[in-house]
Amino acid sequence: MGLTVHQLKAKAAEWLLLKVKYPLEYRLSCQRLPELSHQKKIILTLLPGHDNLGDHAIAYASYCFLKKHFPAYDIIEVDMKEIYRLARPLKRSRHPEDIVCIIGGGNMGDLYRYEEWTRQFIIKTFKSYPMIQLPATVHFTETKRGKREERRAIHTYKQHPRLLLMARDQTTYEWMKLHFPDQDVWKQPDMVLSLDESSKDETREGVLLCLREDQEAYLTKEERQQLQQHIQETYDQVGLITTTIGIRVDRTTRLEELTALWTELKQAQVVVTDRLHGMIFCAITHTPCVVLRSFDHKVMEGFEWVAHLPFMTLLKEPNEAAVKEAVHQLMKTSSQKGEEAG
């Protein structure tokens, strides 16, 4: 299936940004940050500037983790757009103990070119720094473009002499071990699982649906509509939420938006989701959750990290009957989930 005119224009605009505008900003940047040169720092970068709260939760959790475990370091947050303009000033202000951390997530691959090409820019630009790729999922499509982008990524990652790679699922871990036998590769959970946003004070009612409508969805549009209708016919109180909220979010507004979403989850008896961070948000808020698979391995393998929680149920082949039964079972035990999670 060919691309529409709108899609072609969007891809052309993205290419111009990544290949012309942003590299020019990098080369022309003359800003100086002398105040940073006297303090060792962790440059936390590839932060999102879009509306996906899952990615913002990763950035927030990464910041909190680094702040807690590396108190002697200043944590400097730099988003995907800023890094092109600030890379040279940051390098000019380098302290001998500086470290670069790239936030994790599901954008390692060819589905999200902006993020992947910016990751490669960071790896090449900060080649002399110790660098950590925080827990990520890789997915390169089985297409000519996907294979080409995979070769390019492998070549770029291999050129960094001190790059620690972290995988948040087994498939990614095996991919990294295969292609980078001489580099350190760790398997670690998604950074958001380091948070605890649980509360025993909330009154829980009804069911919330949090389902994908993008290129990562496993369910078709018709299947989603049928599932929604089925749940609404079975339960009196059914709501719809999403982790992509339709407004741009940055590091100054992310906690407010995340807190609002987490509060909404904590007021539900059961959540049905096919989103990885829908599942993870339920885990950290101790919200009973029926997890449906996504189009790739991300959700099913991500479930490994929360499978021990008694209020989480995974459906590998979701259908109406299976979802209904799973929701029913969790409804019966939702009042005890706080004590069980304990």
Tell what function each PLM region has.
Residues 1-342:
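Active-site anion-handling motifs in enzyme catalytic cores
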